[in-house]
Amino acid sequence: MESNRTRGLNHELSKLFNELWDADENRMKAGKDYRISLQGKAGYVPAGSNQARDSASYPLFQFVDEEKLRSRKTFATFISLLDNYEMDTGVAEVVTPEEIAENNTFLDAILETKVMKIAHDYLVRKNQAKPSRNDFKAQLYTIWFQLYSRAPGQGPDSCGFEHVFVGESKRGKEIMGLHNWVQFYLQEKRKTIDYKGYVGRQNKSRPDHDDQVLNLQFSWKEMVKPIGSSFIGVSPEFEFALYTVVFLTSQEKMTREVVRVEEYEMQIVVNRHGRYIGTAYPVLLSTNNPDLY
């Protein structure tokens, strides 16, 4: 079935995503704005297991220039959203007027960036977005922040933003989502995330400290994520732009677009939950099992 088959390289999206990469002025620079310590290679963990050998004695993030991070408007407004969600699916979310205002402030901030302007222009050309910025903002709000139910018979308990950027749990036993480096860093700092090691690519014995797409293994509040994937250092608007473009240019339930961005050949995977984003993440193509994400 087309929706689950790996496609050939999408040259059009590769070109667009490299434009977005080059336009990402808010991206944090490896070795200067942050430092990571990859340490050991993670071991195999069967799906559903919460036991993992720890191949990393220290946190992944050795240093992040938080002053610089929080001085950049899109990062600052993004960070303010991270504590607005209930971790467990099956527990109805309650969205306050203050949280709605924070969501809108974040969208206003990213819509001012070159990255989102390029993505918006592309989607307008593809007839997938209206030219009006306000219309596009409303479209983004629906796609990313509209609540829906992941657990049958339950009230609205999730949204695309929560799953992808914040992370959530399934019955307190399984980590779902959490594909964002800022949330990973902040949870590491609170000692709720324990980095277990990197998951290597077949064509590269180990990642480099300046790699900006990584496959990781970690535990979060006693649950283990056997493989989690994340961009490192990129701005929130960069990820929003990538995933929104893939979501709006495909009607499939599961879309895997193969792209080359900088040195990284990867799939951008986006799962559709009706009119909303279910999940979205990058997969380095040499990873053995993309379905563990």
Swiss-Prot record:
Q: Required co-factor? A: Mn(2+)
Record keywords, A-Z: Endonuclease, Hydrolase, Lyase, Manganese, Metal-binding, Nuclease, Nucleus, RNA-binding
Keyword Manganese carried by entry: yes
Reaction(s) catalysed (UniProt annotation)? uridylyl-uridylyl-ribonucleotide-RNA = a 3'-end uridylyl-2',3'-cyclophospho-uridine-RNA + a 5'-end dephospho-ribonucleoside-RNA
What GO MF annotations does this protein's record show? lyase activity; metal ion binding; RNA binding; RNA endonuclease activity
Q: What's the EC number here?
A: 4.6.1.-
The active-site annotation reads 163, 179, 225
What SUPFAM superfamilies has UniProt attached to this entry? EndoU-like
> Where does the protein end up?
Nucleus
**Family from the record:** Belongs to the ENDOU family.
Its biological purpose is as follows: Poly(U)-specific endoribonuclease involved in the processing of intron-encoded box C/D snoRNAs, such as U16 and U86. Releases products that have 2',3'-cyclic phosphate termini at the 3'-end.
Give the multimer and partner information: Monomer.
Return the protein name. Answer: Poly(U)-specific endoribonuclease
Q: Which organism is it from?
A: Xenopus tropicalis (Western clawed frog)
The gene name reads: endou
